[in-house]
Structure formats: structure tokens, C-alpha cells
């Protein structure tokens, strides 16, 4: 009986750990590097030098439906209006990382 309880406990711990681990984890530090090299010229500090009202600040992202990694990744991949498409220049992982970085920074009001 004691062995059965031990096996059950180990199985439960293993499943809990496995199920709580995300399928992928974005690298925010890499996202910061990608942002600095590709986005900061127009979006320094979460701003927007081309369209002043479409910033990367949390409120603007929410207002324009861009407050998810998927939405940001789509925009980076495909571009829109004055923003060029980066799909041919950045890898999928880099795009995922920069989206995570933007969301992370917007949650901190771009305060670092």
C-alpha cells in the first residue's frame, strides 16, 4: 500500500510539473536585442515616431487589439501601413521573442 501511494504521489508531481510547463517559452532578453536592432528606431521607449497614437504602451495595445503575443507576432511578420514586414528578416523565434518583450515592457509602462 505504501509503495502504491509513493508511485501515485510521484505520478501526480510529474504530471503537474509537465502540464504546467509552457509548450514554448519566449526569451525576453533576446526579444530586447531584436527590438533594439529592428524596432527601436520607430518605437523607442514604446513610442511611435510615425503614428503618435499607435504606441506600444499598454493602453494603446488594448485599444487597437494588439495586446496579445499572437496579434503582435502577426503585425511584425506581415507589417501594416508604414510598418514594414519583418517575416523575411526575422526567424519565428525572434518574432515570438520580440512580441514577448513588447508585452513585458508594456506591462511595466516601458520603465525597464
Curated annotation (Swiss-Prot):
Pfam families: Cytochrome_CBB3 (PF13442). GO terms for molecular function: electron transfer activity; heme binding; iron ion binding. The keyword Iron applies. GO terms for cellular component: plasma membrane-derived thylakoid lumen. Binds 1 heme c group covalently per subunit. Its main location: other. It comes from the Bacteria. Residues 1-25 form the signal peptide. Monomer. PANTHER family: CYTOCHROME C6, CHLOROPLASTIC. This is Cytochrome c6. It comes from Synechococcus sp. (strain ATCC 27167 / PCC 6312).
Amino acid at each position: 500500500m505504501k509503495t502504491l501511494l509513493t508511485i501515485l504521489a510521484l505520478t501526480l508531481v510529474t504530471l503537474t510539473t509537465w502540464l504546467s510547463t509552457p509548450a514554448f517559452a519566449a526569451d525576453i532578453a533576446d526579444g530586447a536585442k531584436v527590438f533594439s536592432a529592428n524596432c527601436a528606431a520607430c518605437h523607442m521607449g514604446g513610442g511611435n515616431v510615425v503614428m503618435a497614437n499607435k504606441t506600444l504602451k499598454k493602453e494603446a495595445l488594448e485599444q487597437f487589439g494588439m495586446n496579445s503575443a499572437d496579434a503582435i507576432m502577426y503585425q511584425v511578420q506581415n507589417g501594416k501601413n508604414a510598418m514594414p514586414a519583418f517575416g523575411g528578416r526575422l526567424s519565428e523565434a525572434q518574432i515570438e521573442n520580440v512580441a514577448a518583450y513588447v508585452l513585458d515592457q508594456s506591462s511595466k509602462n516601458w520603465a525597464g
